[in-house]
């Protein structure tokens, strides 16, 4: 048995050695953490440097290509932006944080600075894209579409193609469309709405005109089609007006119909209702409970907010000529290709076999297009076959060159941009 003083010495030596070992491990761990933190900082700086000057399709491509790096390093995650945190997808969340973060450039500049406007394209089922709304704007598309459903006890409008994919918490009309649009329009309209000091480089502060979301063409209005899906269209309309569109109306951002002169006054954003919308003018111009009027003049008692204005337009049936004169004044008329072919004693099946519209079909459909234009309506044909690609492209050409359709309805923005 060892003497006590030797045991004590050995124990002290053991404690000293273990202490040195833990100290070395801790030092290595801290060093690795410091290196990792420094690497992340450098990577974040590289991403921010790369993004300078990028916009449009190049910006979209950069985010899709570098998403793992951007997400893993949380490049923009800690930025404080007015729209809060989204949880739509990894790509959407990262892109959203970049757009609405502390970067000094205005949002419209980031999105559309070098973008060529494509005025004849409608982004069908826009909400299916990886970046709803933003992707269409980066391609220069001037018309987008969102399908909406009444959810959460009729207090919210969720964006979805059908009831199976409804997500009212993360994919509502305000999260995907109205909140981003309102923020963008606030950035470029009026000194009281400026969040960025250099936004004045884009627009003249003394200009009283409302400016839109396209950097190179600030006078162009973005058309937003809202497709009513729920059976209760009256409640859908009431919620749309009072909750989602009211902030735009208060800032004069919406195109409207002057109910006294029947004149359409263009704004940065044009709202068109499609699908199962209410058709009665008594519903469209209903007076909400909180609406007030500053006068007892009968002429001031028109419109949903009793301001003599109607802020939405109906997507009128292109294939029903006799109704166009009877329905409310509007800006758009649409029909499916199948509906028009039926009117022309043909069918979609025959067209698919042939691969293009015949001369007789073109002549017949052209009459419907011309009739709509007599009422100053833009036109759109939906339900165009997407396959084979050669048929789709041929039909795109026939719509544009032979029929003079105003909006080519498509799900493929990349191909139509190169068309």
Swiss-Prot record:
Task: Look up the signal peptide feature and give its range.
Answer: 1-31
Q: Which UniProt keywords apply?
A: Signal
Which positions form S-S bridges? none
Q: Name one GO biological process term.
A: lipid metabolic process
Q: Which domain of life is it from?
A: Eukaryota
- Coiled-coil annotation: which residues? none
Q: Which SUPFAM superfamilies match?
A: PLC-like phosphodiesterases
Q: Which InterPro entries match?
A: HAT_RTT109-like, PLC-like_Pdiesterase_TIM-brl
Q: Which PANTHER family match?
A: ALTERED INHERITANCE OF MITOCHONDRIA PROTEIN 6 (PTHR31571:SF1)
Could you say which protein family the record assigns here? Answer: Belongs to the AIM6 family.
- Provide the protein name: Altered inheritance of mitochondria protein 6
- The species is Kluyveromyces lactis (strain ATCC 8585 / CBS 2359 / DSM 70799 / NBRC 1267 / NRRL Y-1140 / WM37)
